[in-house]
Amino acid sequence: MDFEDLVTALAPPPNRVGKSDGPHEHHLYEGAVMLAFAMHLLRTQGARDVRIHPDGEHGKQFDFTTWLGRRDFTKISSIGSTTYGGVYGNPAGQTITVHPKSGLGDVVAEVGNHVISAECKGGIINTRHPGQVSRLYRGLCETVGLLMATPSQGRQIAVVPLTESTLRLAERLAPRCALAGIEIALVGSRGEVMDVKLAETAKVMAERTGA
């Protein structure tokens, strides 16, 4: 994946000035995480139709229609009362359905004879602010908790932004999550998706720290 427009760069509020790498905070919003993971399922997992279920706040933060349009996904039909809800299709016959409704799983797809269901969270990926780093931690814990509370129909995946802190936490959680049948995936700033496995995380940590 190489998407240059998933991250939204914003000036930090006064209490977070100087607490990010660079002058702007890089927000990887939850809606962007959903779309990146949906594209991952279409491109690498053999899915043909993926459904995402954002809420109203996600639609305010991220322009689903414009982003999908840049990837040759044209709106075929509308769903609900929002401007972005609907079915989007590309020339290859793949579809992404944007259905603004909670309680259905953030990203859902059927691949072969099983269902993939993902819960997603976003966050600021270049922050050093303790509160925002903690928010990234909580996001991963919340997604895992939601999946544990949901009856499994197939693969269950917790999906959050890739940062050094989420990578460390994911590595610690992965063994116990595996016992519960839950996978963890981390989304990078350009849409790359890493399935967390202990050997892989060690390699990625070394690459990110220059060790």
Model-derived regions, located:
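Non-catalytic C-terminal interaction segments of nucleic acid-processing enzymes
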Residues: 1-10, 134, 164-211
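Nuclease catalytic cores
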Residues: 2-81
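Short amphipathic alpha-helical segments and their helix-coil junctions
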Residues: 10-20, 114, 125-131
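Terminal targeting/leader modules
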Residues: 16-29, 91-94, 205-211
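Acidic carboxylate-rich catalytic motifs and surrounding loops in phosphoryl-/glycosyl-chemistry enzymes
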Residues: 52-57, 159-165, 188-189
